[in-house]
């Protein structure tokens, strides 16, 4: 069962109202974790049944257990903390009020990352006609979170330069992939909005750099992704989904792929690309 299939999907789905209500109650201490997990299990089971019913060969949990598509994964590592944001992230017409996520020490992998348990539940639904796909933020997406202008000064409290960050980040991903592979994962997807920001007209301002600096960032993003991909088990299929952000049906960036194509399309060693067009 290899991906991509002739008809496929990225893997994130709109949350059912019952799940959104449950998460709000949980965050307000009106619902316990066990009760929230029970509702998540029920809604994921319904989603997987629908995916199979419609003839898809890939099954996902719709990212139903996450607060965001990417930050929850980062919060599962040592050295990372998060707190309620005051400003949010700018999307067109609206700011996404996602938790500020930042270093409080050097990155490290701790056993029992929550996503391993998430995948193990999904993996139970695999059979000879269906493969479970896990979506996680690409290493470049994680790196971007730590080296953007709003974060770099804090990051440099713990690292001398970006190359040091990459070394620890790659090690974290290698350990996570080893654990999720042992749990049965053979289809992993890197979700990656980092390239979308790089093609936007505002990229030089957003990254607070010049043209040469932007080219170096592109090189770093390819490097960190490939360092992880090249260290993964050979029978683990790794695809990537590249987009320009999506929050309440609005976008974070815009622009054609021309500026990043010589880097990501030519050199990134993924099995397949899922692309906006």
Regions found by a protein language model. Name each.
Residues 1-277:
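Domain-level signal for soluble alpha/beta catalytic cores
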